Amino acid sequence: MIKVHYQDDQENLMEACSGVMNTLIETDRGVKSAFSDLISREVMEQFRPDKDHFLIHSTAMGDQETYGPNKNGDGWPKEALARKHQTFVTNGHFFREHRNRDPKLKIGDIKYAAYSPVSEGGMGRVELLKWGHRKLAEEEYEMAKEGKELCFSMSARVPLDVCSCCEHKAKSASEYC
């Protein structure tokens, strides 16, 4: 089963981020400071893009215990985000408009992922550093330079879906209660 998550579907997280989920990081003159408590200046410098790419900082998703489910009623438990956030880097790519089946269609790559647990004073969310290819993601780059908000979706293969009301487990939509 594939579950889709849009950044702006988690209203409480959007509010906590003041509506800004993606930010273009200009690195032409070096990285002057950390972007967030989770992504340090050193990490940003380590993932500084080459001349063919630009850098986007994204707040990807928040855990359901802190921010609740998204508009579809889907949520990701903090334990799952703590354990699996690196799969954004190992399995993920940067695509346009949910064209995410063929890696040949990617417009960039996810270079870094981190999760900050609330129990350790964090925000209970996953943050990413993404490289967008300046030519393949030209539209996104221009929008980001103009300060326009970008919104990306994420998807994941999950073995089953669990109903938030009765905890019924379904392996496909046809098994939903």
Tell me the role of every PLM-derived stretch.
Residues 1-177:
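Signature of dsDNA virion morphogenesis modules
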